[in-house]
């Protein structure tokens, strides 16, 4: 999978999980201690996440990082 497609797919998986929790981007970004604009770029697939950042996002969503990877067929 190309990196751009991977990041877009991961961002969509993260967005889907956040929306299922009925939490706004701003509220979620605050919850995980991240600036909203940066978090928004993650959901759009415009940021290459470090493992640490992916872990913060997954923890905020209440899932394991592996579950997010499965959501986007990695």
Where are these predicted regions, by residue range?
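A short, Lys/Arg-rich alpha-helix, primarily the initiator
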Residues: 1-19
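Short alpha-helical elements of helix-turn-helix
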Residues: 12, 36-37, 51-54
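Alpha-helical residues within the helix-turn-helix
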Residues: 19, 30, 59, 70
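Flexible coil/turn residues that form the inter-helical turn or adjacent wing/linker of helix-turn-helix
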Residues: 21, 50
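Short alpha-helical DNA-recognition segment
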Residues: 22-44
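DNA major-groove recognition helix of helix-turn-helix/homeodomain DNA-binding modules
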Residues: 52-67
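Short amphipathic recognition helices of helix-turn-helix/homeodomain-type DNA-binding modules
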Residues: 67-74
